[in-house]
Amino acid sequence: MGILTYDNLKVGNTPLLRLSNLENGELKIYAKLEWMNPFGSIKDRAAYWMIKIAEKEGLLSKDKKIIEPTSGNTGIALACISRALGYKFYAVVPQAITDETKILIKKLGGEVFETPDDLCPRFGKGTDQSIALAKSIVESYPDQYFMPNQYENEANFLAHYESTGPEIWKATEGKVTHLISGIGTGGTITGAGLYLKEQGNIEIIGVEPQKNHHIQGLRNFEESGIPPILSKRIKIIDRWIKVSDEEAFTAVRLAAEKEGLLIGPSSGAVLAAALKLNKEHIKGTAVLIFADDAVKYLGLYTKLGVLNSEQLDILRKLSNALSF
């Protein structure tokens, strides 16, 4: 690629893949493979837009360091972009995220601060400590730090309104009838969802995990505060589908066995929701947001027995390629 600039950073335009082996009726199921973004997840979009707009508006300059609360993928994307553009990056993360995620952020030049938090709850009800810590640092040293704040930054919403939504509409030739997405900050489902609703009668479905879940990147809103990005446009969501850990990890296994896809836990939760929808004998075309693949979850999948030995061997080779 050469020197990284905003002009040659190819974020977006990820493919749609039909999951025909998982269809069971008249609902066509397509997955948007967001791990095909340059830094491996859907969060590349928000990170790219937040930094680009911050520089353009003069909120971020080379004398500042970037700090962000993240459950993983935004931190990875920001670490990559920060390193390429010459910024120092600090990720404030929940202790519960996978070791692979923490290691990768560090290998990309970022520093990691851990908090017990409900961004990926495993310790009971939290108080969004990662967000609170990052905000307190910025408030104490406003001349030294810039926090993109994916939970409130309109650039997060715009990234999906301007890219993800239009890509889905174009790729399906306007035939999409359902959008199914997990929710972390709410940027994806509100941005892509609003765009699609403006085009036609599209049902927007939000996926919510169980309490005390193990699905990195998603939120249970009985445990966690509703991010401002989501709260101001929450009515865009027509329906919520609850998914348990067992359902999500069963869907991860199905994706591997039936489609040869090694997907992350949040993608498994989204697939589980689609399979529930499929049982309702609905006609149409559903697009699922697969936020990332399984490469950062080798330890978790091994511990929980999510994949078989052959699948884990493939995943281990992918992880080794990233030097975890």
Task: Please describe what each predicted stretch is.
Residues 1-324:
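PLP-dependent amino-acid enzyme catalytic core
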